[in-house]
A protein has these predicted regions:
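Noncatalytic modules at the cell exterior or secretory-pathway interfaces
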Residues: 117-131
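Hydrophobic residues positioned within well-ordered beta-strands of beta-sheet architectures
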Residues: 77-79, 113, 124-126, 139
């Protein structure tokens, strides 16, 4: 009897959560509800003292639409119009309060925004300006309610279902994590949460490339809405004319925040959630990589800690906002652990023939994330193969490396071929470096500066950036000395399974 009660303690909540999940899925599958604002009923606002006024020697008139009742939720507002002045603005009112505004530009005929209504019923109206000299023609104003609330409910139910199932498995004894495993999991979760502290607010810290990546996310979303898949042209860029950014910058992983945008989540939340996912993946990947190589759980935690809390990682994530680069980092660990398995595993092991899969996934992730990282990883891989040439050119190992390279290229051919074709035939800045003086030699540093650790007198001058920030620094220099010492110390010993030799 007690066992039956113990089972029902988890079965009944799971059943309720499954029913709720099915309910939210049905609501999501229903067509989006659209609410049209009655433009024909627009009236001149005679009650306002400022309804008529002069601007540029022409009489301006403020018009108000009939209110439409909107239920609580997140909405996309779309305006189709024609106007001759870019200064025309549509104000969106919820009752007597202005909640949003849209600037109507003469260059476009469609504008859109998103807004949120928190009350159960919201009397929404719009006002706009027009004059006889440059009249504004509003074709239609449509509010489309998104499934944001339903998706939030579905995600919440799925999380509760996962927690309930996991608790049931632990309670039933089917999963018995040790204290060490529990502590490891808690430490990894703690690293992820702490590393994402800058995300826990209602603003976005705009780094160097934030606007560019936000435009990419919105570009994918709008491209999907226009019927493109995969999205080759971002419609929003260049005043609606679009731009083929995906030809030069892989965006496979940006479909995650773009789909979140389609679900009704805000751009800010989608962007932050994506960074959170990247940090979580990177921490877990680095942990398993170092643990696999060192066969030590503590070293795995140390490696993940040193990575996620490194100054460069924080600068890259929140200062430079190099989303492509930080996405690629998580896949670096897959490449390292994959090559480690290929070079250290017994070639006669039955599992050896499948060891190309993990590094192939790693190379694919880097290619789809960041081109510069791809070049660096390719050079590092070639150098590793040459340094370990005695192992590289053994038949089975060489075949595994060959399968890794060929599979990585084949899987990403849809991106690589257009990229190479565009680099060769398109007139872009990177291919005209001789004309614009952006050669590597003009922006590099002297060999001596690479090892500088002092701060030059020209602290505020341009050369300071090249001399200090691109120098290796004290930490790297000391680390290099340690590696050289260890290598010399153990050079005459059997170090087949010593991980530091591989890393060095």
């Amino acid at each position: 009897m007690k066992k039956e009660i113990k089972k029902n303690k988890y079965i009944i909540p799971c059943a309720i959560e499954l029913v709720l999940a099915l309910f939210f899925i049905i609501l999501i599958l229903l067509p989006d509800r659209e609410y049209s604002v009655d433009i024909s009923g627009s009236r001149y606002n005679e009650s306002s003292d400022t309804a008529a006024f002069s601007r540029n020697n022409s009489e301006m008139y403020r018009y108000v639409t009939e209110p439409v009742s909107l239920p609580m939720g997140r909405y996309f507002l779309k305006v189709n119009y024609e106007c001759a002045e870019t200064s025309t603005i549509i104000y969106v009112y919820n009752g007597a309060k202005v909640i949003q505004s849209i600037s109507l530009t003469a260059e476009n005929n469609i504008q859109s925004l998103e807004t949120w209504f928190s009350r159960l019923s919201n009397p929404v109206s719009c006002t706009f300006l027009s004059n006889n000299a440059a009249p504004v023609k509003i074709d239609n104003i449509v509010f489309r309610r998104t499934d944001y609330i339903y998706y939030m409910g579905l995600i919440t139910v799925i999380l509760l279902f996962t927690i309930t199932c996991f608790a049931g498995l632990i309670d039933s004894g089917r999963i018995c994590p040790t204290k060490e495993e529990t502590a490891t999991a808690l430490l990894l979760v703690g690293m992820i949460i702490i590393s994402c502290i800058p995300l826990y607010n209602d603003v976005i810290y705009l780094g160097h490339d934030s606007r560019f990546h936000l435009d990419r996310i919105e570009g994918i979303k709008e491209g999907l809405l226009s019927g493109q898949f995969p999205v080759s042209i971002y419609p929003l860029i260049n005043s609606g004319y679009g731009y083929a950014t995906p030809l030069f910058y892989g965006d496979a992983f940006l479909y995650i925040p773009a789909v979140m945008r389609l679900m009704g989540f805000t751009l800010q939340f989608s962007f932050k959630a994506f960074i959170f996912m990247i940090n979580a993946f990177s921490v877990i990947a680095f942990y398993f990589c170092v643990k696999k190589i060192t066969c030590n759980r503590k070293y795995g935690l140390l490696g993940a800690f040193l990575f996620i809390f490194s100054t460069y990682h924080f600068s890259d994530t929140y200062g430079r906002a190099s989303i492509g680069e930080i996405t690629a980092w998580g896949f670096f660990s897959l490449i390292v652990v994959g090559l480690w398995n290929i070079y250290t595993m017994d070639v006669d092991d039955k599992r050896y023939s499948h060891q190309w899969i993990v590094p192939m996934i790693g190379y694919t992730g880097v290619i789809e994330s960041h081109i510069i990282s791809t070049e660096l990883v390719a050079m590092a891989t070639v150098l590793t193969c040459l340094v370990l040439f005695k192992r590289t050119f053994k038949l089975k190992r060489f075949l595994n490396l060959l399968k890794t390279a060929s599979a990585s290229i084949a899987v990403n051919m849809y991106f690589i071929l257009p990229f190479l074709d565009s680099m060769k035939n398109e007139n872009v800045v990177i291919t005209r470096w001789k004309d614009i003086d952006c050669a590597m030699q003009a922006n590099g540093i002297h060999l001596a500066d690479l090892f500088r650790v002092d701060i030059p007198q020209m602290f505020l001058e341009v050369r300071f950036f090249r001399e200090v920030y691109t120098g290796l620094g004290i930490a790297f220099g000391l680390g290099l000395l340690v590696i050289i010492y260890v290598f010399i110390r153990y050079r005459q010993k059997a170090v087949k399974n010593k991980p530091f030799i591989f890393f060095s």
